[in-house]
A protein has these predicted regions:
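Short beta-strand to alpha-helix junction loop
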Residues: 56-66, 107-128, 265-266
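N-terminal FAD cofactor-binding segment of flavoenzymes
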Residues: 46, 56-87
Length: 363
């Protein structure tokens, strides 16, 4: 059996790892020049590595991928996780800063963690063995998948063709909604309906270094009472729990509230907007103490186009395989409903691989 994996994000890399363990032939076709997808890091901005993409370890999402079990249970010798417990949480609304003590209780209940001295990218990257890396074709965006015969043919933007018995699609759902990949024959109506019903929000992260710390551990702009899966914009001290001597404030925005940031035309316009917003909250101190910044605008990232899914569609239909030939995995495609989290994406890859090898069609 020969398998093609489209996408080298968390799900694609995990699927490759699972197939390697079973000694099954596969290739990974990755559109960008690097693997990781929405799992990305920068090591040179601060005195600790920074997650430019997925950052939190959402323990409340009980996805059980074999690769993440030791990590989630705190038994991984290579990757230390600490409990994320910010001490000062404020909300800025109608020109006033207010303490939000109840949010501390909520965060304790959610029990999120963060990497102490590494990142989600480091965790995914350690699965990419030298043998696997030889199987990854970088800068190879797939634009067409033909599946009318027993053999599947995937065609890249450059015209190169790859052949296999089965294909696993792990691209962000935004790419399927935009029909970046042509399927021949076309996807059935029920699959297209499920894909288009899902929402994929805008999203970005910005990290700013200041010469002085003038901000709390977390500050929410506007209403703090909303579904964080659907919309959020929060500034947070990125050094909480880290061994750092720097003053790094981060902005994470996703969903409808992120559009005011992601829609700005230039990075300068975005920085000016953020500093003005912070100056209003903190009496001009953001501009006064600004040193440098780094921006990761996921809405403008090629082959991604946003943050993550909003759980609006039918996950079971989204992830259901087609004719025992085309399979789906990723953070939006976990049939058990454990979506969004990186370990949810990893679990979806194991479930898809299992279905491939057993020819099980859930629909």
């Amino acid at each position: 059996m020969r398998i093609l994996i489209v996408g080298a994000g968390a799900a694609g890399i995990t699927a490759g790892h699972a197939l390697s363990e079973k000694r099954i032939d596969f290739e990974i076709l990755e559109a960008s020049s690097v693997h990781g997808g929405r799992v990305k890091k920068t090591a040179g901005f601060a005195d600790f590595p920074i997650d430019l993409g997925a950052e939190w370890v959402h323990r409340a999402i009980k996805a059980k991928a074999p690769t993440t079990q030791a990590l989630l249970s705190g038994q991984s010798p290579e990757f230390r996780i600490f409990n994320y417990r910010p001490k000062t949480i404020l909300q800025y609304k109608n020109g006033k800063l207010r303490s939000k003590r109840w949010m501390k209780l909520l965060l304790a209940l959610v029990n999120d963690g963060k990497f102490a001295d590494s990142t989600w990218f480091d965790f995914i990257d350690q699965l990419v063995t030298p043998e696997m890396k030889k199987k990854i074709h970088y800068s190879t965006p797939v634009i067409k998948i033909e599946h009318s015969s027993n053999e599947i043919v995937a065609t890249s933007a450059s015209g190169e063709q790859f052949r296999a018995d089965k294909v696993l699609i792990t691209v962000p759902i935004k790419m399927l909604q935009d029909e970046y990949i042509e399927f021949a024959p076309a996807l059935p109506d029920w699959k297209k309906k499920a894909i288009n019903k899902e929402q994929f929000g805008d999203g970005l992260k910005v990290f700013i270094e200041f010469s002085e710390k003038f901000y709390p551990d977390v500050v929410e702009i506007g209403s703090a009472i909303r579904n964080p899966l659907e919309s959020d914009d929060s500034y947070y001290d990125a050094t909480v729990g880290k061994n750092s001597s720097k003053n790094i404030l981060a902005l994470f925005a996703h969903g409808p509230t992120a559009t005011k940031y992601t829609s700005l035309k230039t990075d300068k316009a975005l920085l000016d907007f953020i500093l003005k917003e912070l100056d209003e909250v903190f009496d001009g101190q953001a501009t006064r103490y600004y040193k440098k910044h780094i921006i990761q605008n996921w809405s403008k990232e090629p082959f991604i186009g946003g943050s993550y899914s909003m759980r609006k569609g039918s996950v079971k239909e989204l992830s259901a395989p087609l004719n025992n030939k085309i399979y789906f995995a990723g953070e939006a495609m976990n049939p058990s409903g454990k979506t969004i989290a990186v370990h949810g994406a990893c679990e979806s890859a194991y479930l898809a691989v299992s279905e491939m090898l057993t020819n099980k069609d859930r629909r």
